Amino acid sequence: MATVDARGFSCPVPLLMVQEEIKKSDPAELEVLIDAPCAVESIQRFAYHNGYTFRAEEKGDEWILRLTKK
């Protein structure tokens, strides 16, 4: 599973990092670590429009997002 650590970055950087990782490695599963609430919704929309399922788990001030290819 590939991982993108986008903690410390504000929108739209986390989404851009996810797009770059998917373009580079086309992973079956991608874990994304973020602390920018605005990124949750934008990454969720991106996932659905690009053939990935989406799960989000909030842990304090951070989120773990999991994108899995359909």
Name the predicted role of every residue range.
Residues 1-26:
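An N-terminal amphipathic alpha-helical segment
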Residues 1-3, 29-31, 62-64:
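Intrinsic-disorder/low-complexity, polar/charged segments enriched in Ser/Thr/Lys/Arg/Asp/Glu/Gln
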Residues 5-7, 15-16, 37-41, 49-51:
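Short secondary-structure boundary micro-motifs
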Residues 22, 28-48:
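Amphipathic, hydrophobic secondary-structure cores in small proteins
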Residues 27-28, 53:
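A general structural signal for well-ordered secondary-structure junctions
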Residues 39-70:
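C-terminal structural segments of small proteins and small subunits
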